[in-house]
């Protein structure tokens, strides 16, 4: 995603915010640690990115767009779109009820969970991933230094199919959230969302002391059954980008990668279209984006099934293989020179079997 931000002219503006730099990811399970550093990855590319409060990050991008001369409207709802061939008229309404219309030769729908075009034109399609729930907040992380690497993003395996994200920000706050099957959260004690999340945090040995009595910046929020797809990624006069196409899961930051790369790819094709050039949207857009989506999907499924647990926490790991998997975690899911991208649907399963067979022989 850093290449996309760089090409769009956002890098300097984001740097000025002083966001926490991210050099990899740390996975923890029952006290055992697996570390991935992006500098060790198989695919040539960026060795770092950022850990960001999304509100501040998104506002930085929007402000930079305005500086570039792009108008941005806030608190405005799209209520309808009419297409005439590839031309369109979009009706919008602000918070005061004022309506206006926007004429366009082409629409790029990057509305995220809003899913404007899919909802207006009945294009939503269920994901093939099971429904899951995320329960999270931001905390004032006063005891962060209890961790030996206090500024590292950490993913904790709480139990099979249930994991925790810990994302420290440069402002001293930390995002922390539990993710898993909705039934897991029904057994949580507490009569309020805050009590429920505090109970969950207290049940995780890796976080219990660090998060005890910390201040919650906002009442814990829920995202549920968030995995969703669409019947098509493009049509006459429009293209869908980011979460509007398909959102898989918060793990591995796949949403940010797919959002930035899909926007970058779509922008190039929209420019070609507006210049009168022929574009094969299926081949040049959908097939490319599905390569990334399907690679991430294989890793998301392997994560919840426990396959990645076996791989991440194995003894005597092969550095070359670890670097290939690291590239996927860094977002390079289009590099088919990487066997763990090219053969994503089978490579992880084969590796898991090899590790289990080796471990059985050494017992």
Predicted regions and their residues:
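Tryptophan-centric aromatic hotspots in well-structured domains and transmembrane helices
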Residues: 50, 106, 136, 163-165, ...
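N-terminal FAD cofactor-binding segment of flavoenzymes
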Residues: 1-30
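Predominantly flavin-linked oxidoreductase catalytic cores and closely associated redox partners
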Residues: 64-208
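C-terminal helical "tail/cap" subdomain of flavin- and related membrane-associated enzymes
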Residues: 268-363
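Helix-loop-beta segment of a Rossmann-like dinucleotide-binding subdomain
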Residues: 33-52, 89, 179-183
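Hydrophobic "anchor" residues on beta-strands that sit immediately upstream
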Residues: 12, 101, 105, 239, ...
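A short, glycine/Asx- and small/polar-enriched loop/turn
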Residues: 23, 30-31, 82-89, 234-236
């Amino acid at each position: 995603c850093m290449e996309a931000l760089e090409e769009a002219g956002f890098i300097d503006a984001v740097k000025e915010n002083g966001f926490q730099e991210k050099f990899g990811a740390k996975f923890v399970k029952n006290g055992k640690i697996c570390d991935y550093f992006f500098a060790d990855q198989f695919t040539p590319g960026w060795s770092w990115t950022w850990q960001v409060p999304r509100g501040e990050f998104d506002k930085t991008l929007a402000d930079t767009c305005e500086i570039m001369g792009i108008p941005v409207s806030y608190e405005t709802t799209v209520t309808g779109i009419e297409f005439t061939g590839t031309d369109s008229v979009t009706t919008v309404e602000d918070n005061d009820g004022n309506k206006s219309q926007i004429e366009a030769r082409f629409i790029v729908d990057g509305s995220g969970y809003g899913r404007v075009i899919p909802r207006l034109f009945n294009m939503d399609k269920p994901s093939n991933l099971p429904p899951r729930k995320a329960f999270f907040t931001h905390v004032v992380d006063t005891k962060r230094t209890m961790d030996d690497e206090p500024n590292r993003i950490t993913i904790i395996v709480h139990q099979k199919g249930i994991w925790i994200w810990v994302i420290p920000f440069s402002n001293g706050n930390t995002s922390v959230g539990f993710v898993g099957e909705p039934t897991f959260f029904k057994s949580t004690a507490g009569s309020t969302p805050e009590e429920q999340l505090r109970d969950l945090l207290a049940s995780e040995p890796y976080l219990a002391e660090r998060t005890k009595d910390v201040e919650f910046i906002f009442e814990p929020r829920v995202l549920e059954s968030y995995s969703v797809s669409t019947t098509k990624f493009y049509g006459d006069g429009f293209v869908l980008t980011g979460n509007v196409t398909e959102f898989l899961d918060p793990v591995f930051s796949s949403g940010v990668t797919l959002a930035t790369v899909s926007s970058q790819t779509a922008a190039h094709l929209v420019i070609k279209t507006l210049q009168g050039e022929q574009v094969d949207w299926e081949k040049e857009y959908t097939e490319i984006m599905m390569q990334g989506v399907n690679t991430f999907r294989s890793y998301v499924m392997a994560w919840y099934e426990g396959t990645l647990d076996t791989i991440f926490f194995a003894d005597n790991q092969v550095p070359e293989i670890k670097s290939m998997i690291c590239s996927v975690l860094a977002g390079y899911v289009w590099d088919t020179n990487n066997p763990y991208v090219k053969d994503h649907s089978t490579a992880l399963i084969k590796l898991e079997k090899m590790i289990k067979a080796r471990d059985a022989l050494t017992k």
